[in-house]
């Protein structure tokens, strides 16, 4: 049985084609450039003129060399990614000032094409994890031309000052050279779809630069444009932001302005969407480093952490997305932190999140609740041997499932009719309420491996066995395709159906149950054309540990 993609998907494709045609005549002859499209207040990422969800895998920080990437590709493919996230190092492409070498850059890009993967490219310039480690040696060694941040005691630290025009111009020159080369070698293929500018930028070791020049700026007035954008009263940084946030806000303004200038210059050459990621800090973060979580101490000062988002949006308009890296956060913290990045002015993209089982749950949750344009896991190439590390297997299973249903998922995101139910530490299930049906998702008992069968669910919640630990692998997506039709997919759960309260109906019945996938946007049954009509009574669907995808039709009576 076949079905065509929904009307919303067609509208998005049409809109993207119109917009891509207007970017510039220079791009009219090949594939349209990847871009973000906002329709009815919701963002969709368009690749080759079609809606796309990034299923990302990021390699380790020092893996972006041709020989190391050769070892990474099998693990990335085993994880079912459709996009690889890898860095480009300033100190590798410009070892000598003004002399650029893109030979490794080209080799890795060709490898990605050979793997049929898209690329999210990360610029490791002046800032990487609150330090300057990937800047060229000629920058690091010339402390006069490229001044370092001074801490409160006047001691220089391992961070370049965001107030240095010389540093900004050098960083920008290298980034523009890279974007110019990228346009030359990738304009026809459009392998690269998204740019990250710097990496977890900020100052680690000091809340701000205490050099005389920077201190003079700090004691002066807040720029009028920022005051107006944030709807505050004029004054010094302390007067406007208060003593607790003044220094971090000061650093955030100058750092965001620095990075925005680089992003803007790159877009003038090749207008790919850009994002900035952050080492999240402050309230609701899980402390993995046994330290006070303060700006400049527990996390780099000045980055787009959640309490600096308004400032960054005001001072960095050429950055399309601000994202939090939450790869070491438990699921409860993931939800609290990332909810703050879901804003009308900010598409949701999580580039570094899925290193554990928590990431697999977080992915389904983000698809439905935010809704995410993409998701990524850091360090996919890690571990010994050639096999994918065990902690990535569950997210890889999620990716496999979403790859098989992506057209429907995107359409459901756009319509707001996609919901998620994911297991937490003590939660045994979740109620999902749609217009005509009330669904109860019950999480099945915990297997330790995707190869083990789950414990059968009780026949009725009213006669359930005593509480057991919920399966950490239990996660479900449910989408309402029509008034009486649902897409159900997930792992280790059972889904029960009843009519909604007040509907005038007391029971539900399946008319048709199909297992299947989407191929080129068209639903295809995988159970050899058979449908299950009398096999699910009362109406309940069980999802296996290996994962199940169903499309069901019901009636109420």
Residue ranges and their predicted role:
Residues 63-76, 301-315:
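Short, acidic/polar
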Residues 457-470, 485-557:
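C-terminal beta-sandwich/jelly-roll accessory domains of carbohydrate-active enzymes
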Residues 28-81:
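N-terminal carbohydrate-binding accessory modules
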Residues 261-271, 308-407:
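Catalytic-core region of carbohydrate-active enzymes that cleave or remodel glycosidic bonds
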Residues 144-312:
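Polysaccharide-binding and catalytic clefts of secreted carbohydrate-active enzymes
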Residues 364-502:
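Aromatic- and carboxylate-lined catalytic core of secreted/periplasmic carbohydrate-active enzymes
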Residues 69-142, 256-269:
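Aromatic-lined substrate-binding rim segments of carbohydrate-active enzymes
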């Amino acid at each position: 049985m076949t079905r065509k993609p929904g009307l919303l998907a067609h509208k998005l494709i049409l809109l993207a084609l119109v917009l891509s045609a207007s970017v510039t005549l220079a791009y009219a002859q090949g594939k349209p450039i990847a871009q973000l499209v906002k329709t009815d207040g919701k963002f969709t990422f368009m690749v080759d003129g079609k809606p796309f969800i990034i299923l990302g895998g990021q390699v380790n920080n020092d893996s972006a060399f041709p020989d190391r990437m050769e070892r990474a590709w099998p693990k990335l493919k085993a994880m079912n990614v459709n996009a690889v996230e890898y860095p480009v190092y300033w100190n590798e492409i410009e070892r000598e000032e003004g002399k650029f070498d893109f030979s490794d850059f080209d080799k890795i890009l060709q490898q990605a094409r050979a793997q049929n993967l898209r690329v999210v490219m990360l610029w490791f310039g002046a800032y990487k994890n609150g330090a300057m480690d990937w800047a060229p040696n000629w920058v690091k060694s010339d402390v006069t031309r490229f001044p370092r941040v001074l801490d409160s005691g006047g001691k220089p630290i391992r961070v370049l000052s965001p107030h240095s025009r010389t540093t900004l111009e050098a960083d920008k020159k290298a980034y523009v050279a890279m974007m110019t080369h990228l346009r030359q070698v990738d304009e026809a293929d459009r392998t690269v779809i998204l740019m990250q500018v710097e990496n977890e930028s900020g100052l680690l070791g000091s809340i701000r630069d205490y050099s005389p020049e920077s201190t003079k700026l700090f004691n002066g007035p807040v720029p009028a444009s920022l005051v107006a954008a944030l709807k505050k009263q004029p004054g010094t940084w302390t007067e406007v932001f208060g003593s607790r946030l003044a220094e971090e806000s000061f650093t955030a303004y100058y750092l965001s302005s620095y990075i925005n200038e680089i992003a803007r210059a790159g877009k003038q050459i090749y207008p790919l969407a850009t994002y900035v990621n952050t080492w999240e800090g402050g309230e609701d973060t899980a402390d993995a480093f046994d330290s006070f979580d303060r700006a400049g101490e527990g996390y780099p000062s000045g980055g787009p952490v959640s309490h600096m988002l308004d400032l960054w949006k005001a001072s960095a308009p050429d950055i399309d997305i601000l994202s939090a890296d939450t790869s070491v956060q438990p699921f409860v913290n993931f939800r609290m932190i990332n909810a703050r990045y879901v804003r009308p002015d900010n598409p949701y993209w999580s580039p570094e999140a899925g290193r554990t089982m928590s990431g697999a749950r977080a992915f389904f949750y983000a698809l439905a609740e935010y809704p995410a344009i993409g998701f990524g896991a850091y360090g996919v190439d890690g571990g010994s041997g050639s096999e994918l590390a065990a902690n990535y297997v569950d997210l890889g299973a999620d990716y496999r499932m979403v790859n098989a249903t992506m057209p429907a998922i995107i359409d459901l995101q756009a319509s707001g009719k996609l919901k998620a139910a994911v297991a937490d530490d003590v939660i045994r299930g979740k109620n999902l309420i749609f217009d005509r049906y009330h669904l109860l998702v019950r999480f099945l008992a915990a297997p330790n491996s995707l190869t083990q069968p789950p414990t059968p669910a009780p026949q009725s919640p009213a006669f359930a066995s005593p509480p057991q630990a919920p399966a950490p692998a239990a996660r479900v997506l449910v989408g309402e395709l029509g008034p009486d039709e649902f897409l159900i997919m997930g792992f280790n759960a059972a889904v029960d159906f009843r009519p909604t309260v007040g509907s005038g109906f007391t029971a539900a019945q399946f008319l048709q149950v199909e297992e299947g996938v989407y191929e080129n946007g068209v639903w295809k049954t995988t159970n050899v054309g058979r449908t299950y009509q009398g096999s699910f009574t009362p109406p309940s669907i069980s999802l296996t540990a290996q994962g199940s995808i169903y499309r069901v039709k019901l009636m109420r009576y």
